[in-house]
Structures are given as structure tokens and as C-alpha cells.
């Protein structure tokens, strides 16, 4: 009997000291988009990272403004995410209020390989860039647009689409149009009046415009080059144009939250995002332009994305300054565009 008790005691001790697998596994919470982005992110980034570091990466899908609202509500010391990724216009306020960790290139050495324009303040960085221009159906019988002003051509009446001001592409489009029809990028009265006159279909997500183009609900739309090239890659008869007046940039920005309990892993995930392998995957599969200047792309992909010779031409706005005036611009937009 004594031997049996000893054996049971030994088994309990062995079981209690054995590794508990998933029960001890760290979970890293990151934000990301759905759809095709999610597919490429899982294959190129998440699965290899989980395997290498024995962690669980939980991806919260949505849009930048939703994630920032959740972060601000939770407070800087108890963030719902370890890694916050999205469009830059949503981030100046939480950055100013100390929600983000200082950039760490010892944990993420690929930061040293970024174009200087990709560094934002002391906390953040752009991982990918896309150019905002005009996308049109090549089978619609309309002429190829060359200028932003072509958006107002009568041939597109009822068949053109853009975004609400809350969308990053939407406010960039508003700025460009404000300069064309007014005094400068921030002559919002002129820009809103011009867009109102065009009476476009208005959406809040770029994926919606991609569906509109695919289903031929519209034949001309404001869209980034990456989204257009993805449509073309799937056999949709569309083409993208860089209007003659210039193309603003849609930047995909990332940072580690200050209150994260997993900062070292969080920065390592960002380093993986910036690696030539992952940057190449996003360029090849989704046509997002790498911000890591050491990335060497296949020639057929390099022709479709931003290259070293394009960097000086990029139109990047000071979103920290924009954030101070955005509420009043949004109020005007909502009042005029109802």
C-alpha cells in the first residue's frame, strides 16, 4: 500500500512539473485588416512568427478609428492591443497623449533599413505605402482619366465613387480637390463644394469600392494602386492612374502600445513585418510598396509599386496638424453632404 501511495505521489509531482503547452503560451494581440490582407498576413507573418517564438498571435480585424477608440477608452496602462497597426491619420492624438512605446531598433533592427520618410515621431513607422489615384473600368468605353478634374466628367454621372471624410483615402482626396478648386490643400470649403457637385457614391471602406468596381456599379473611383493591382491580378478589367496634379500617400503605420506587457515580442513582430521576406510577400501578393529600402522585388512587381526613384515625389501630410482641425472639417462635411 505504501508503495502505491509513493507511486501516485511521484506521478502527481511529475505531472505538475511538466510543461503545460498552450496554458503557458504568451498571446500577442495585434490589429489587422480582414479579407486578402488577413490571408497574406497569416501565411507570411503570423504562422512563421508563432512557430519561431512559440507564441499565439491574436489578430483583431477592423479599421483604425475603431481600434483607436478602444485604446483611448482603455487608457495607456491597460491597452487592448500590444501592436497597433493602421492608417496614420488616426494616430496623432494617442501618440501625443503618450499611448505608444518609444521606437526600439535594438529589438527591431530592420527599422535601420527604412526610408527616412517612413519614420514618424519617436514611436511609429510606416511599414507599407500605397499611392492614392483614380481607378477606372477599362471595358466601360470611357476615356482614360489623366487628371483629378476628370472625376467631374459628365460621362461618369451616377457611376463614380469616393469615400466619406472619416476614411483616410477620403480625406486625402478632399485635400487634393481643395487645392485644385481652391487656394490650397486645406481650403476645405472649396473641396466639399466640388465633391458635393459631383454627387458621387460615398462609402466608408476601400474594400467596398473594390466590390463596386468588380460588379460594375461604378466605372471610376478613388482608390490606391495596391487595391487596383489586386483587382487586376484577379482578372477584373481595371487600371490605375496617377493624376497629373499629384498622388497623396496611404501609409500603413505601426507602433507598440506603451502599456503592453509583451513589448519585446511586440517589437520582434514589427521587425518581422519589416523583414525583406514579409515586405516582399505583401508587395507580390497585394502590391503594397515596401518601406524597407533593402527589399529587392521581381521586375514585374517593382514596376507596379513605389520605388527608390519615387520617394522624393510622395505627398505626405502632417496628420498631427490635421488632427487639430479635423473635427470642424468633419462637421462641415456631415452638414453639407447629407
Sequence positions of predicted segments:
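A ligand-binding cleft/hinge motif common to bilobed small-molecule-binding domains
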Residues: 90-93, 214, 219-237
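A bilobed periplasmic-binding-protein/Venus flytrap-type ligand-binding module shared by bacterial periplasmic
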Residues: 133-140, 176-179, 250-263, 281
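Extracytoplasmic ligand-binding site segments that recognize negatively charged/polar headgroups
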Residues: 34-42, 66, 80-217
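Periplasmic-binding protein-like
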Residues: 130, 192-196, 203, 234-258, ...
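Early extracytoplasmic/lumenal segment of secretory-pathway proteins
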Residues: 24-92
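Mature extracytoplasmic/periplasmic domains
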Residues: 257-317
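Conserved C-terminal helix/tail region of periplasmic/extracytoplasmic solute-binding proteins
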Residues: 313-338
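Short beta-strand->loop
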Residues: 101-110, 122-125, 220, 236-248, ...
Amino acid at each position: 500500500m505504501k508503495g502505491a501511495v509513493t507511486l501516485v505521489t511521484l506521478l502527481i509531482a511529475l505531472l505538475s512539473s511538466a510543461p503545460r503547452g498552450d496554458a503557458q503560451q504568451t498571446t500577442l494581440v495585434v490589429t489587422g485588416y480582414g479579407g486578402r490582407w488577413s490571408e497574406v498576413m497569416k501565411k507570411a507573418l503570423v504562422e512563421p512568427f508563432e512557430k519561431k517564438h512559440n507564441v499565439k498571435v491574436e489578430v483583431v480585424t477592423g479599421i483604425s478609428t475603431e481600434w483607436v477608440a478602444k485604446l483611448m477608452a482603455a487608457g495607456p496602462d491597460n491597452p487592448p492591443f500590444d501592436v497597433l497597426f493602421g492608417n496614420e491619420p488616426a494616430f496623432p492624438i494617442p501618440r501625443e497623449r503618450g499611448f505608444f512605446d518609444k521606437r526600439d531598433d535594438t529589438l527591431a533592427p530592420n527599422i535601420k533599413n527604412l526610408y527616412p520618410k517612413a519614420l514618424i515621431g519617436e514611436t511609429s513607422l510606416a511599414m507599407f505605402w500605397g499611392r492614392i489615384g483614380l481607378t477606372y473600368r477599362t471595358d466601360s468605353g470611357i476615356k482614360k482619366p489623366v487628371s483629378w478634374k476628370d472625376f467631374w466628367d459628365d460621362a461618369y454621372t451616377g457611376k463614380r465613387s469616393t469615400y466619406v471624410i472619416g476614411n483616410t483615402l477620403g480625406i486625402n482626396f478632399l485635400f487634393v480637390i481643395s487645392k485644385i478648386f481652391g487656394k490650397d490643400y486645406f481650403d476645405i470649403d472649396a473641396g466639399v463644394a466640388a465633391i458635393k457637385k459631383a454627387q458621387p457614391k460615398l462609402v466608408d471602406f476601400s474594400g467596398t469600392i473594390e466590390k463596386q468596381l468588380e460588379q460594375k456599379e461604378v466605372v471610376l473611383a478613388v482608390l490606391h494602386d495596391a487595391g487596383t493591382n489586386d483587382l487586376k491580378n484577379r482578372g477584373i478589367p481595371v487600371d490605375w492612374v496617377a493624376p497629373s496634379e499629384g498622388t497623396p500617400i496611404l501609409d500603413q503605420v505601426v507602433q507598440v502600445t506603451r502599456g503592453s506587457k509583451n513589448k519585446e515580442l511586440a517589437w520582434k513582430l514589427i521587425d518581422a513585418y519589416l523583414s525583406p521576406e514579409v515586405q516582399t510577400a505583401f508587395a507580390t501578393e497585394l502590391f503594397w510598396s515596401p518601406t524597407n529600402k533593402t527589399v529587392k522585388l521581381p521586375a514585374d512587381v517593382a514596376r507596379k509599386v513605389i520605388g527608390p526613384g519615387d520617394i522624393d515625389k510622395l505627398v505626405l501630410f502632417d496628420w498631427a496638424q490635421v488632427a487639430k482641425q479635423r473635427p470642424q472639417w468633419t462637421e462641415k462635411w456631415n452638414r453639407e453632404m447629407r
